[in-house]
Amino acid sequence: LRMSGKELISLFLRELLAGKEIIARCELLYRTYTYVRRADLGASERKELQKLVGKPIAPGIFASIMGSDPGFNLPRRDSFTLIGGRIFHFSHTKKYSKADFDQAYRQFLSSIPELRILLRDSLVDLLKEFMAEAGYQPSTEGGGELRFQAANRRARAFVFGSIRSIDREHRATAEEDCILLVPSGENLAPFVEFFKEEGERAAEMGLQIWVANMERGTIDHFV
């Protein structure tokens, strides 16, 4: 028998949490998005999960693991600590040594290249969902560029891993909007710095810089 989408997501997450009892907050979030994508949910499965954890699905499941919502029955990671400036989560029911936390941090560092890929893929998923709700349909995708079309408007979109990595050479045209999407961060300083140094220039070039809050599953206009 084929496993349901919910069962697949649960399986993926249980395996992850069994292997990483101490896990970086960002890694758990990105992998949750990835597992929802891999489950390839049908329309009815998607509606069922949205009733259970809210819309969008990945942030709702993530919140459940954090212990704020019992809707998705997964092992809780309801305590946290800072390691190397990063938030790591673990269960309050078990005691861990300094060596355990050091090992978790080393595992995280070795996973960074993969996590960058997962972050981009998750941002693309979120952007497609956001644009669809705004009445846009995807037309083409490739070379790091996504194109969308609505009844009387077109848009090009580019996804970046951070505000600091934005390519400033893009430009909007009279016929086509240009959207640069970046994730929100635990630190606001890079956004303040960008706004002071590049905000006026970005506005002159017609760029729309959007910020995705992946924990809430929202996208907001920045510049």
Language-model segments: what does each one mean?
Residues 124, 163-164:
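Short, well-ordered alpha-helical scaffold segments within catalytic/effector domains
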Residues 147-152, 156-161:
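Extended, charged alpha-helical interaction scaffolds
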Residues 2-151:
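Acidic-basic catalytic patches of nuclease active cores, encompassing PD-(D/E)XK
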Residues 130, 137-142, 160-163, 169-223:
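Charged, structured surface patches that assemble and position nucleic-acid processing machinery
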